[in-house]
Amino acid sequence: MAVWTLGINHTTAPLDLRGRFAFALDQVEPTLRALRGSLSRQPEAALISTCNRTEIYCAGEKPELEHTLDWLAQTGGVSSSLLRTHSYTLQDDLAARHAFRVASGLDSMVLGETQILGQIKNAVRAAEAAGALGNTLSQLFQRSFAVAKEVRSSTEIGAHSISMAAAAVRLAGQLFEDLGQVKILFVGAGEMIELCATHFAAKSPKAIAIANRSLENGEKLASRFGAEVMRLADLPDRLHEFDAVVSCTASTLPIIGLGAVERALKRRKRRPMFMVDLAVPRDIEIEVKALEDVYLYTVDDLASVVQTAQASRQAAVAQAEAIVDAGVLSFMHWVDQRGSVPLIQQLNAQADEWRAAELARARKLLAKGEDVEAVLEALSKGLTQKMLHGAMTELRASDTAARERASAAIQHFFLRKER
């Protein structure tokens, strides 16, 4: 059984390319079905898609890395050569090591972050719902969860880390002298916006508003922070009211355009605006960054901020890598053992066939009134003869080399002393 991974992340691909391969959670199931349908052997498959990475994990009799890459490139509307330049492909132990490192937060933009674990669990549930998760990938991900748990409980990998949400607050604090006088607009109502709202609310801003396509979801989040709720459609007309805008939606197209921001700046009389776009693909048109009075940051721009505390945690990283290595060895041992399962099943089936035949014969003899001891003796001899027939045949082979190999194997399997 082979395991393989194909992916792009924040270190290998720019934001706009990652945006072409971003899949919302409700898109994962149909995407997995399409992927498996495009491959010749219908492998097990799972798809992880976050703002920082898109990764496909597969397991099957033979790896189909090139076909997987070609399919993903076509899905994203780019050439295979371009995707190959910005992606990574891993097999077997390297694929397992990567999965364990990702789950443990070792491969994240924010070293040791825990959000990725929930995202992987969502991906596993989606793979199960799509009928794409088999024994091998199930083991891979369950073991990745166990490794991640041990890493977080046994090391200080997450100590002093700065989340994306905290980084956004830190940058806002550099622009505005007093966040208590700032009006903040959050666009979206997902997990990332909830985290950002929590961090900003701790600074007691002057006002908080939440714009969302679904008013119901927006109201649920707004109730936690005493925030105003507004329709997404009203955003262009009210954008000028806010000093800071943090956006993270699942939209496939930008929802805040250059024209809307220019009009907002004009109505603000050029007072600066702080904007954070945490969405992949982008929520805010990239051209907005060129405006003189706008300070726009993307997920990639926040990288230098969130990584400031990582150097002091290298000892924890080394400990975590050792835990990952142990997990990889254990998983690969399990995979190797799985290769013997068909033979074990065949051996058990053959033994059951012999047992059933001898048992049926014994029952017939007992029904005829034969002596019980004689029947049991015949039963045991019959089973013994059937089990040893193949070995005896090999020992009588005319080929000397074959006899020697058979002799060594038989001594190993049949003549071991009881311990």
From Swiss-Prot:
NADP(+) binds at residues 188-193. GO terms for biological process: protoporphyrinogen IX biosynthetic process from glutamate. Its EC number is 1.2.1.70. Keywords: NADP, Oxidoreductase, Porphyrin biosynthesis. The active site is at 51 (nucleophile). It catalyses: (S)-4-amino-5-oxopentanoate + tRNA(Glu) + NADP(+) = L-glutamyl-tRNA(Glu) + NADPH + H(+). It is an enzyme of class 1 (oxidoreductase). GO terms for molecular function: glutamyl-tRNA reductase activity; NADP binding. NCBIfam families: hemA (TIGR01035). Possesses an unusual extended V-shaped dimeric structure with each monomer consisting of three distinct domains arranged along a curved 'spinal' alpha-helix. The N-terminal catalytic domain specifically recognizes the glutamate moiety of the substrate. The second domain is the NADPH-binding domain, and the third C-terminal domain is responsible for dimerization. During catalysis, the active site Cys acts as a nucleophile attacking the alpha-carbonyl group of tRNA-bound glutamate with the formation of a thioester intermediate between enzyme and glutamate, and the concomitant release of tRNA(Glu). The thioester intermediate is finally reduced by direct hydride transfer from NADPH, to form the product GSA. This is Glutamyl-tRNA reductase. It comes from Albidiferax ferrireducens (strain ATCC BAA-621 / DSM 15236 / T118) (Rhodoferax ferrireducens). The lineage of its organism: Bacteria, Pseudomonadati, Pseudomonadota, Betaproteobacteria, Burkholderiales.
